[in-house]
Amino acid sequence: MTDSTAPRLHVQALSADCAEAARRWAERLGLPLAADDEAEFAVQVGEEGLQVLQLGPDSPGPVRVDFVEGASAHRRKFGGGSGQMIAKAVGVQPGIRPRVLDATAGLGRDGFVLASLGCEVTLVERQPLIAALLEDGLERAGRDPDVAPIAARMRLLGGNSADLMRAWDGEAPQVVYLDPMFPHRDKSALVKKEMRLFRPLVGDDLDAPALLQAALALASHRVVVKRPRKAPIIEGPKPGYSLEGKSSRYDIYPKKALGKG
């Protein structure tokens, strides 16, 4: 997105006790701390952490990252474990927990699922505010005795995924996972609410073919791309096979078999 179309935001402390934390976030994100009557979004700092609120009468409510309670906790406890389609897509099997690079981390939901299954997950998020929400959520998760071991398997990097993958230093991830932004067809209230935040801030991933190319060059074993079930494949090489669910599809680009150990 260009600066001319970027939405206006300001940072707001929800209590006097959070004023200093709000000041630090405003400085880090380069956003004004004072109230802005023309702001479209408020970055709010409260006792329960960081959240973003779309302002105006039709606001869907705040969006935050919470790995301890809510949807993530429910999926961790009742989501089907290694039988979930995402687990099959990345190659989770008995004795096999691949190292995963989630190159389009967003709010970290899929990365958290993989980490909860025992995978070491590196998350990359290019939009600084979304990355801040994710950082805040991981920090709070690290203080919870039940979730801290999962959060410890998640490492967050900020920046452009394609650039980071091209300049990767060290052991390559076995699996690169991509979930590019697209016009969502998911009708759930949660996804609608998050899309109203994401789309103005992030826009669609028009660089998905470049992401796929960089992922295929880096991953040692496979690349997995999550798509809407009826969406075309990303421009470039064709996937080896796909796993299809009710609303989503996982296109798998295998390079070599994952082994135990």
Curated annotation (Swiss-Prot):
Q: Which reaction does it catalyse?
A: guanosine(1516) in 16S rRNA + S-adenosyl-L-methionine = N(2)-methylguanosine(1516) in 16S rRNA + S-adenosyl-L-homocysteine + H(+)
Give any Gene Ontology cellular component: cytoplasm
Check the UniProt entry and state the signal peptide residues, or none: none
Q: Which InterPro entries match?
A: 16SrRNA_methylTrfase_J, SAM-dependent_MTases_sf
Q: Which UniProt keywords apply?
A: Cytoplasm, Methyltransferase, rRNA processing, S-adenosyl-L-methionine, Transferase
Task: Provide the protein's localization.
Answer: Cytoplasm
The EC number on file is 2.1.1.242
Example GO molecular function term?
rRNA (guanine-N2-)-methyltransferase activity
Q: What does this protein do?
A: Specifically methylates the guanosine in position 1516 of 16S rRNA.
Protein name stated in the entry? Ribosomal RNA small subunit methyltransferase J
- Origin species, per record, is Pseudomonas aeruginosa (strain UCBPP-PA14)
